Structures are given as structure tokens and as C-alpha cells.
Amino acid sequence: MTSSQLPTPEEIRSLYQQGEEAVVAAFEQLATLVRALEQRVQVLEDQLAKNSHNSSQPPSSDGFKKPKRRGLRRPSGKQVGGQPGHPGQTLKAVAQPDRVQVHPVKRCQACQASLTTAEVTGYERRQVFELPVVRLEVIEHQAEIKPCPQCGAVNTAEFPVEVSQPVQYGPRFKAQVVYFNQYHHLPIERTSEVMVDLYQQPLSGGTVVAASQQAAQQVTPVNTAIKAHLIETSEPLHLDETGLRVAEQLHWVHVASTADLTYLELNARRGAQAHADIGILPQRQGYVVHDDYPAYYQYQIAQHVSCNAHHLRELIFLHERYQQLWAEQLLTLLLEIKQAVETAQQAGQTALTPSQVVDFERRYQALLDQGYQANPPPVPDPDRPKRRGKPKQSPARNLLDRLHQRRSAVLAFMYDFKVPFDNNQAERDLRMVKLKQKVSGCFRTQHGAQTFCAIRSYISTARKQGLSILDALHLALAGTPFFPPALQPSALSDA
């Protein structure tokens, strides 16, 4: 029986006349339908109750009615505003200005007498920081042609390697084109408009694409070195992925990153096959930080670390949606452990005391036990046919199982201070991929998406190293891309 096949009044009277057994059977069918509808309503209400602060949904999905956020940060004791020692960005006068413009005093403000011939006794100074008028500089390269006085052969000098065309743009100009198109996500046509507005230089869309492709090709050796280094580094490696529409199909951009390096790669798959294609996770033996997506755990040679930011959001959801007291208490405990680790680090300690670890582990297990008592396993319906696989569980039970089975990954930050509490590093490194998708909607070709990932890996790494993005792109387009210090030949040989 379905909701569209409910009995009519005539059918109900007929059932009543058939006797008690017929009525009981009809009620059992209706009860089964009600339970199914209740489960469906619960799933739909759960979806509506989720937002950016209690799930992995992005803030852009919240709409105009922002949810009331639960503050997860604890008071730091710091005053509001800039902190002592903060460098600031105050505009300050310089000792040697580029140009001085003198404003003469012509008449006395008191008696109106002429001051044209009066002696200047001093100056009140004010400085204006302004852009000069910018125009493209055209550099003509001339290769000498000389006949040989001995044999008469005509000889022509060689042009520099970077001067390969009769007319072309230089690396600094192309760096700005790539900067606007790839870093600030301006579409091709708007990038062309910007170059006209800034330099009065019309630019075709093909030139923008060609500049980006050239930059991607030039930074390939850097990205290859980054990828190899991330496999071997002793630092915790952050992993994540996000969906991207490419050539009318769903693809995935995978990130592997540290605080100093970023590597992005496009793949048509999300899970284990993508990790095998990329080749970082299968060879990784150190810490890997990620969410609870099961495909990550298929590679057991790595030391897995679970992102607790995801756990906090799920615990908030369970407490708000189902009033699960244990969820709020476990959230508080995780934040308490995090605070204890930070306090110990500030005190110069390298680990928590054994008594602290034992106490936190005991309280963690006690809250899991409390959660299991509040969320017993589902009771199979004897009237329903058996299905393959595990019976469907509640969201609370699923989270409890993950927190229990992967407790070492959840609490890894407590055992080793090198391990971060969350996977925010990878999420930050993927954020610009989503911004690019918001601006452009999709990539029409795989080659365009791969170009974006290659350039984004390079400029994200350069930014982490404190290098100007424009300077990094100029170096790449000039044929000498920037290599981070950790990837220099001397550093690699020492390692």
C-alpha cells in the first residue's frame, strides 16, 4: 500500500464487514506506511535543518537568512583591534620623494603685501602617493647582419631565446594577463577589457588563453617537484577534494598541501581510483589529514588524522536537531582537549601529561557509551524482506561508530602536537576552486581546468612563501619559475 492507494470509505466498510483479521491486516499495512513516511519526513527535515555551521554545506547555501551561529572559539583575553607587535599598514611619508612640487606664497595673509622676493625660511611638507601614467614600452630587438670579409658568407646575430616572434608580448605583460585571469578569476573577455583600460592595448581572447597555457607549461617542473616532496615530507599532509563541472561532466579537483606547499590535480573520479591515479596517498607513510570519506582509509600505510571541524559541525547538528546531550558534551570535550594542547605548547611542552591523556580518553569513551545508550541499533522489521548490507542507521549512530572505530585518528592531535586539530588548510587551498566555479560556472574543456590547477598550485605555493604573485608569474613566463627553498637542489640533497 502506498500513500496514493489509501482505502476509500467504501473499502473501509467492506474490511469491517470481513471481520477482525481483515481490519488488523489493513491497520498493519497502514502502520508500515506511516513508519516509512515518518522516516522520509525525518530525512527531509534533516536536510532543511542543515546549514553551514552544523554541516559541510558552504555558507553560500544559507541564503539571505543566516543561521544563528554557535561560537566554537573560547575567549582569548585579548583586546579588540590590532594586537601589540602587529606591523600594520599605515601610510608613512618617505625621506626621498620621486618628485617635489613647490607651492609659493604670493601675498601676506595679514596685510596682503607681496612676498615674491621674500626669503623662504622653511617648508611644510605633505606627500601624495600616486600612480604614474602607465604605457606599454616597445623594445625593438635588432640582430646585426655582417658579411664575412674572408669568405663572403652573410652572418646574422642570434636573438635572445625569449624573443621568438616578429611581434610579441613580453613576460611582464603576460604575467599581468595571467594574474587577472587565473588569480582574480576574471573571464577572458573582461581580462581583455582590463588591459585596454590600463594600457590602451586591445587583447584577443586567444592571447589570454595562450598566456595561461604558457604559464602552466613553465610551472610544470615546480609542480612535479612539489608533488614528489609532499609524498616524502614529515609534515602532516592535508587532503581534500571538491566537485567541478568540466566539459559538461562532474569532475573532482584533489588537493594535497601543507602550510608551505600546494598541489592541485583534476580527476574524473573522487575516490580510491583517483588517489591511485594521482599517486600521492598510495605512497604516503606519514600523517594524512582528511575528512571521513571512506576512500582515504583504503590506504593503511599512512597515519590517518580525522578532521575535527567536521565532527564539531555534526555534533552541533545532533544537539540542535535531536537534543542529544552527549553530543554537546563531546563537542565541549574536544574543544577542551584542543585548548589543553595549545596551553601546553605555549608553555614549551611537547606532550600532554600521562594523567591528562588518560583522563581525556576516559571521558571520551564515557560520552560514546552515553551516546550508544541514547541511540540503540535499529530493530529489523520481521515483516520486511531482508536487504543486502548493513541495516540503515540514524545519523547519530553513524557518527558514534566513526568516532569509536577511528578514535586514534580523531584524537591524533592530542597524542602528537605536530598533528593539527582540523583540515582547514586543505579547505582553504580549495576555496579558490569554488570561487572560480561561481564566476565562470564551469570549464568547457579538460585542458582549461588542468591549466587552472597547474597555475593555482604554483601561485598558492608562491603566496605561502611570501612571494608576490605577479613576481612569481613573471619569473615563470621569463623561463625561470620560482622554486620554494624546500625544493632547491641543495635542500633536496641534504634531505
Features from the language model and the residues they span:
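Short, flexible loop/hinge motifs at secondary-structure junctions
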Residues: 1-168, 234, 239
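Catalytic center-proximal scaffold of phosphoryl-transfer enzymes
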Residues: 17, 143-147, 152-495
